[in-house]
Amino acid sequence: MKPNSLALIFFIGLITLAGQACRKPAGEGGTSTIRGKVYAFNLRNGVKADSGYVGDIRVFLHFDDHPWADEETRTSYSGDYQFKWLTKGKYKVSIISECDTCPMEQTGVFENVEIKKKNETVTAPDLIGYY
């Protein structure tokens, strides 16, 4: 191979690596938003007594496939929540729900969400819990 060919291959490889290093993972620092609502069933003695969108519920945001919560917010009085300033990527939103048959009588409820472009507002499916 000629020295110029080796230099060209090296240069192309360097540009490829630099481009990948500049990509942001899912998380903060972008211009997109995830929003959604929390719907709850009120249980009394194991019977559904009431239901509706509910306020003051903790909602967690997980970046990529993190098992831990990277961000947290609470729902408004109408059950709405949002996470702002996010980059493109895959996320999960979750709540903790009561569960009579689960360990510690609670379980996680998760929904997958993907932001595909900048300045996008994505509406997540309702998170449905029992309280």
Task: Spell out what each predicted region is.
Residues 55-57, 77, 109:
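Residues that flank catalytic or metal-binding motifs in active/ligand-binding sites
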Residues 98-125, 130:
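Structured interaction patches on ligand/partner-binding surfaces of diverse proteins
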Residues 82-90:
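Short Pro-Gly-centered beta-turn/loop motif in secreted/extracellular proteins
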Residues 63-80:
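Short, acidic Ser/Thr/Gly-rich low-complexity loop/linker segments typical of extracellular
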Residues 17-42:
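Bacterial Sec-dependent N-terminal signal peptides
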Residues 1-21:
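Sec-dependent bacterial lipoprotein signal peptides
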Residues 32-34, 40-67, 88:
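Short, ordered, surface-exposed loop/turn motifs in non-cytosolic proteins
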